[in-house]
Amino acid sequence: MERGKMAEAESLETAAEHERILREIESTDTACIGPTLRSVYDGEEHGRFMEKLETRIRNHDREIEKMCNFHYQGFVDSITELLKVRGEAQKLKNQVTDTNRKLQHEGKELVIAMEELKQCRLQQRNISATVDKLMLCLPVLEMYSKLRDQMKTKRHYPALKTLEHLEHTYLPQVSHYRFCKVMVDNIPKLREEIKDVSMSDLKDFLESIRKHSDKIGETAMKQAQQQRNLDNIVLQQPRIGSKRKSKKDAYIIFDTEIESTSPKSEQDSGILDVEDEEDDEEVPGAQDLVDFSPVYRCLHIYSVLGARETFENYYRKQRRKQARLVLQPPSNMHETLDGYRKYFNQIVGFFVVEDHILHTTQGLVNRAYIDELWEMALSKTIAALRTHSSYCSDPNLVLDLKNLIVLFADTLQVYGFPVNQLFDMLLEIRDQYSETLLKKWAGIFRNILDSDNYSPIPVTSEEMYKKVVGQFPFQDIELEKQPFPKKFPFSEFVPKVYNQIKEFIYACLKFSEDLHLSSTEVDDMIRKSTNLLLTRTLSNSLQNVIKRKNIGLTELVQIIINTTHLEKSCKYLEEFITNITNVLPETVHTTKLYGTTTFKDARHAAEEEIYTNLNQKIDQFLQLADYDWMTGDLGNKASDYLVDLIAFLRSTFAVFTHLPGKVAQTACMSACKHLATSLMQLLLEAEVRQLTLGALQQFNLDVRECEQFARSGPVPGFQEDTLQLAFIDLRQLLDLFIQWDWSTYLADYGQPNCKYLRVNPVTALTLLEKMKDTSRKNNMFAQFRKNERDKQKLIDTVAKQLRGLISSHHS
């Protein structure tokens, strides 16, 4: 029962659920009915629900039928009216179709026109859009075209600026266009191209200034020369408030605008063409010859590109290489002045360019870099000049070189480079210049001395007399009073040598100009060089003349006279140096001239040569002596050779009238002593083993002839018998043997007042031995044999006593 109740309860619940589902189906949209139906299929009462659903459908059909039946008449009427309307509608449709056909026919052209208008409007919109886009693109294209034009005309820095504007201002506005992407891709390439082209221009510039450095330097040195000439003119004229040209005035200010489109700023040649200037026009500035725009452009371009340091390093490296090339002198530079000039021009040109770069760029080169280059250049230049100047043997070339070095130093000093070392080196070259002058003047003196006739200068008129006196400081009142023609005591080489000494002093003075030396230094330099000229060059030249083999006594006498007058002229040379240097001789540390010593030495050498020459002549005459030492005949006159010798000596000493008295007296005494010594040697020589009393008698006649010559006073100034003393040894020896006064000799030997004081026992013994041998072999007088034996015994006795004197003397 309970089970029945439970089934009934379940049936009621199912029925209620089905009712709910049906209401949902009726009230729910068809699209959302799926979940409701799923709940039916999920349950177990599917059949009942279908039955319930059929029941509900039948109920609704009945209600619909009832409703239709209630409204049927109205429906029929409506259908009737609808049928009527359909006919009218058909008519209306036909009319509309006909109207449409007519309208289509009539509006076909309009439609075509409208279609054309539509296309036109579309084109207008497209054109307008295109114009707008082109207005955005046109500046880009214009800038790109401008960039290309600038690249084509080599305006690289403006091109780089244009490229910057193009990249950062214009291209971002139209970056979605394909051509812009192409441009963007080309920008790095263009930058590299600009960079490469500007570097190429820089290389061309560097190569150009390397080739034209000598022209730049030549112009700069001409400017410096003009300025120096102008300063010299100003210094010679009264001036008020004048100022020396400053370093700033040496520069030509370059107003080079890098972005300028002027032809000059866009030229890539480092050197501008300069027309030949007229002589009276100003020499163009060194920088006027150079267009530095390639350097400025390249510097700015690399700065903009962030590679300034790379550019600076490259520029300095290349210029260092060029400096080494410039500083390498040609091997034949020393041969001509043009070689030195070209070398200096290149160095000056190099540093003029670098100095201008230093003052017109910000940091491309700095003072430390310039100083480093200059130190290197200075050391190499000085080394090259020392080497090549040492080859110079022409003093004129050395002097021209000195002037060129001074101009070189002055030019670089204007640009602020220290040049003290160059002037120090010039002091070294000064010594070399002095040596070349000494060599040149050695040739001049040699020519003068070789061409001189060594005869007093004859003058036949007042003009000739004044001409000689004007060339050489000579005063002689007695000579002035003499009538013409008359003669100066000296020969022509005296005024010539004196004037050449003055010319040498002038040549030394020329070198000291522009060396910034004080008057005392110049005076000291001239005096030292002149002393070298006198003590070495002129002295050697005089000594060479004096020592010549073919020099005659007349020439030697004239040389002594000439050197005497040159010695007197030394004070005038002192005055001459004082006048040109304005340094008084009394100044402390002033070097004195050694001319007096030089001429004294030369005169003494000439005197010695006279003595030697005289002795040689005497020896030549003595070689003609032909004594018969075994003769028994007694002669009555002197030997012929001796007579000729005495005649030669008389004529020779007659020439000595112009010599100083002591010189003539010394020469005469020397000749007599040498003659006496030679005669003594002739008498005692070993080859003469035997001699007779007759030979001694002849020898005695020759000695008497010599004594007669000495007594005649061939040279004035000797006291009585002074000259005869030269023959006193011979006289006493001959008297001893001829008078055979051995008892007196042996008795008085060693006493101060001995009659034969000058006879040496050795000499007497030697001569006695020669006579003893003769006595032994002489058999001519047999009837006097006892007398001969007595004489022989006497000779032996005397010889024995002489040996005793000799041995006692030695002991």
UniProtKB/Swiss-Prot annotation:
InterPro entries: EXOC6/Sec15, EXOC6/Sec15_C, EXOC6/Sec15_C_dom1, EXOC6_Sec15_N, EXOC6PINT-1/Sec15/Tip20_C_dom2. The keyword Coiled coil applies. Residues 50-119 form a coiled coil. The keyword Transport applies. Residues 260-280 are annotated as: Disordered. Keywords: Coiled coil, Disease variant, Dwarfism, Exocytosis, Protein transport, Transport. GO terms for biological process: exocytosis; Golgi to plasma membrane transport; intracellular protein transport; membrane fission; mitotic cytokinesis; vesicle docking involved in exocytosis; vesicle tethering involved in exocytosis. GO terms for cellular component: exocyst. Belongs to the SEC15 family. It is linked to Spondyloepimetaphyseal dysplasia with joint laxity, 3: An autosomal recessive bone disease characterized by multiple joint dislocations at birth, severe joint laxity, scoliosis, gracile metacarpals and metatarsals, delayed bone age and poorly ossified carpal and tarsal bones. The exocyst complex is composed of SEC3, SEC5, SEC6, SEC8, SEC10, SEC15, EXO70 and EXO84. Component of the exocyst complex involved in the docking of exocytic vesicles with fusion sites on the plasma membrane. This is Exocyst complex component 6B. The gene is EXOC6B.
